[in-house]
Amino acid sequence: MATKILDTNSITGASESISATTKKPSATKAKTDTETNENSSLHQFFLSALKDIYFAEDAIIEALDKMQEAATTEELKDAFEDHQLQTKKHVSRLEKVFKILEEKAEKKECEAIKGIIKEGEEIIKSTEDGSMTRDAALIIAAQKVEHYEIATYGGLVQIALTLGYDKAADLLEQTLVEEEDTDEHLTEIAENYINFEAEQED
């Protein structure tokens, strides 16, 4: 009977093939989304917009003090007080977003919010103390602030998702929902407590 000779060349080739397909995992650490995007123009714009709204939220906290003091009805005073407390939470959330991005929490002067707040101060000066007309005007001023914030946070959420910053997007989304709720609440106060009585004033 013929003896079967083992083909050592085939074995060697097979072992080399197996070795080639079972490479060791790379020791290089995968980059985070932030590290990947930090030099992109969209990331830089996102960061600039965060600094902008960070400044704005601080300015709004101060403005709400004056608006609460100037308001006539307890309903509106309470709404301004509640929103001031809420805005402080928004500032804290923004600081968490900066931390997620591994960036220093910095403010950039926001001309838009400064203009809206200045308009609110002019309303206080130009309306009668204790009048419903003042409250109606203050609600409009406050809703201008809300609409600015809603537009800003809505845009920031979308950019965060585009850049893959999902945790940041979740935090910004929470604030966006709260801003929308505040806007609706101010409308309810105007409709239920203020506008009709303001219309009756001389």
Ranges and model annotations:
Residues 2-202:
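Amphipathic alpha-helical hairpins
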